[in-house]
């Protein structure tokens, strides 16, 4: 039992690092409405009002954007690998050069376009 826990620890640590973001990046987004090229991997934006935010080039791997309002947001060149956009409003959002790999899209399909 003890041996299996010790063997699992490196994997748990690695997984935690994949889903972490710097708190100052989240605070920057909340206060300024912009966080271009920020790493917000694993952030929970469930039902968040993110209208017209600037997330140009942001890293949003594993981010929960479910039912969030991203209308008019700049997501150009953003990386959204394994992000969840189910029910999100992307009306007039700039998605130019955004990367979606195993991302749940607003209507529930999974994008494998950029994998």
Locate predicted features.
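Cleavable N-terminal signal peptides
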Residues: 7-8, 18
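Tandem repeat scaffolds
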Residues: 19-115
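Positively charged n-region of N-terminal signal peptides that target proteins for export
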Residues: 1-4
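Ankyrin-repeat-protein effector appendages
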Residues: 8-10, 114
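Short amphipathic alpha-helical "recognition" segments used for binding
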Residues: 6-7, 28
